[in-house]
From Swiss-Prot:
PROSITE patterns: THYMIDYLATE_SYNTHASE (PS00091)
Gene symbol of the encoding locus: thyA
Protein name in UniProt: Thymidylate synthase
Species, as recorded: Pseudomonas aeruginosa (strain ATCC 15692 / DSM 22644 / CIP 104116 / JCM 14847 / LMG 12228 / 1C / PRS 101 / PAO1)
Subunit structure: Homodimer.
GO cellular component: cytosol
Pathway in which the depicted protein is active: Pyrimidine metabolism; dTTP biosynthesis
Domain of life: Bacteria
Main localization of the protein described in the UniProt heading: cytoplasm
SUPFAM superfamilies per UniProt: Thymidylate synthase/dCMP hydroxymethylase
Amino acid sequence: MKQYLDLMRHVREHGTFKSDRTGTGTYSVFGHQMRFDLAAGFPLVTTKKCHLKSIVHELLWFLKGSTNIAYLKEHGVSIWDEWADENGDLGPVYGYQWRSWPAPDGRHIDQIANLMAMLKKNPDSRRLIVSAWNPALIDEMALPPCHALFQFYVADGKLSCQLYQRSADIFLGVPFNIASYALLTLMVAQVAGLQPGEFIWTGGDCHLYANHLEQADLQLTREPLPLPSMKLNPEVKDLFDFRFEDFELVGYEAHPHIKAPVAV
């Protein structure tokens, strides 16, 4: 994951100080891209230990179309707690937009189901896109989508995915986002009968929070370790049938976890 450390180092050396919504302050650059060959290993950061359980359950929760944290709480995942209301609701966030985008005529569009159907019918389509950024509903969301839009691409029997992340919390958020969309790419590839290709991460406002600088500097002193591999249950043939038990991370070795505060 040298690409990730290179981004962190670039922001430390060239980032502009900016105020932000949380009042914490950030050091920021605009526009950055990282590419990960999924055949070379699963892109889970090794310079600090990452909590894969949270990554997997969050992705499954998105795919369910859920916007209440009850499922996450049931499985010991607390990453959305700070934004939920007293009933555990978050408003029309990722899962709702992915699975039930409201159309003007009253219909609800299942973008994920449409994507899977299009992949099988016309894998060369340039419309293999899912968007979570719905301007009409931004004000109703507890947190507007940071990872806003992703697109799939098929070539030579391989499936690649590119994510556009408008707001990228480099220390805490980005390692989760890379692993989450890499995992989604593996899942979609298996169901569609394709091999995994690349995951391409494109960031807009790429920032380190001012209270993450010491942690980032510590991480930059560490040497990346070999990437692990991710095994999926080959019996799963429908994207919505995946369960937590269908994933096995093999050979993950990482440096110790580095704690940092979440900016809410």
